[in-house]
Amino acid sequence: MSTLFQAVQDSFGLNVTPSHFYFPIPRLKSFNGKDWDACKPCGGLNFRIDDQVSRLHDDILPFAPEWNFPRNKNGDWHKFHFSNGYFECVDAEVAYSFVRRGKPRRIIEVGSGNSTLLLAAAARKNAEQGSPCDLISIEPHPAPFLQDGVPGLTQLIVGPVQKAPLELFRTLRANDILFIDSSHVVSIDSDVVYICLRVLPELAPGVLVHFHDIFAPLDYPEKFVRTNLCFWNEQYMLEAFLAFNSAFRILWASSAMQQFRPDVLREAFPAWDESFARMPSSLQPFVPSRDGKRVWPCSLWIARNFEFAERSLAPAA
């Protein structure tokens, strides 16, 4: 490819690639006839659905009285609200409750925005009850309200996570949280590659990890692919990482719960009802929904196992 042609592409924010099976961008016509609602096999992945239902009642619902988030923007940029188009019902309540329940000493967030407001609110509540939290956000393109400062946000690191030293993630301990909402793209030197191949193996036993926009056991939503041209692949790397992996276990998978136990979600999260339908129409093209009424929750929570860590750290014979 000539230098001039590459320069022209860069000036328009484009990258023209061949339509060929060696390239990661798929041919859209190859999806003709695909059943996007089909539940796909996930091999060695164990969603532990019964455990998730128990965790919902034991660790999440006790904090339901605190889920008093506004359903729409109310003018306060420092207060989390639903219908924001990024971090929505079910995922928000679960994240808030995990922070309140675990009382983490430190949260490292990779990819900041509306989730930062939610995490900061939970961290402030913990601090009021004597459990302060160090909330660090890593974001290459922070929104103005983050740069202005958010109560409860300890530090904002402006830059890609790939530049963050591994020593930072080694500071996380049991009940601490690594909260990830990345580019969702596996490519050379991408944030997803750095997180999955470099950061996750360094985490201490008991650290909780969150990934967003994980739709397993289904594929990415059709409109993400066909309309928004988002050819994400983070989910497939995570499925491969977790398959037959005794070092990590799934704590909560919103999409799997929607697939297998939607009745439980409807009863537990009242705000979920009509959460997509009441959203401003300008945001709906970017927000997934399976029925046109409710948002498609898509958080995945995993944890580093104590048992595996104890075995792996045992001295060699």
Regions found by a protein language model. Give the residues of each.
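A short alpha-helical cap/connector motif
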Residues: 1-108, 114-210, 214-317
